[in-house]
Amino acid sequence: NIPVFAMPRMSDYLKENGPWSQLVSYKNIVLRPLKHDKTLSFGALSVTPFLVPHRDEYSETVGYRIEGPNKSAIFIPDINKWSDWQTNLAELIKTVDYALIDATFFADGELPGRDMSRVQHPYVVESMALLEGLSVEERNKVWFIHMNHTNPLLNTQSKESKSVQSKGFNIAIEGIRLIL
C-alpha cells in the first residue's frame, strides 16, 4: 500500500506493463493521480507538478514546484533544451529560493562517437549562458543536478566545476539538504 504519485500516462504505463503491473495488482503500490498545475498538500509542504518537454514515448515528463513553510523550490531533473519550453526559466528562478535543474551533460562532445543533438538535455554551459543576466543572488539559487557519469562537474576539483561556481551557480552533491 505504498502511495505512488503519477501523471495519467505514467499511471497507465504502470498498470499495463509488467513487472510494474504486478505491484499495482498486488497492491504493493497504490497509484495516486497527479495533474499538470494541480497542487497537492502534505501538511506544511505543497507540491505542484508541471509538464516539461522531454522524451514522452512512454509517459509525461514533469518538473515540480515545491512550497515549504518558509521557502520554495523548483525541481527539473529532465528536460529538452530550454528553448523547447514555453516558460522563461530566468523569470521562474526569480520566484523561488532554490532551482534544481537538469545538468545531465556539461557541454557538447561529452559522449564520444554519439550525436549529442539526439540526446535532448540542456548543457550546463547553455543553462549558464541563458541565466547570465541574472544577478549573482539569483544565480546562487541554481543547483545543477542529475549529472551523467561523464559530466566533469562530478569532479569538484575540475576546471569546469570551478568555472560554474565562480559564476555564482551551485553543483549539488549527494546528501545535500535545502531547508524549505
Segments from the language model and where they lie:
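Residue-level recognition of the N-termini of beta-strands and the immediately preceding loop/turn
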Residues: 1-3, 27-29, 139-142
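Active-site HxH/HxHxD metal-binding segment of metal-dependent hydrolases
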Residues: 1-24
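Short, charged/polar "capping" segments at the starts of alpha-helices
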Residues: 9-16, 151-154, 179
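Short, solvent-exposed loop/turn segments at secondary-structure junctions
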Residues: 11, 54, 105-106
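A short helix-to-beta-strand connector/capping loop
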Residues: 24-30, 43-45, 165-168
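Core dinuclear metal-dependent hydrolase active-site scaffold
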Residues: 31-92, 176-180
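Cap/insert and terminal regions of metallo-dependent hydrolase folds
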Residues: 70-72, 80-176
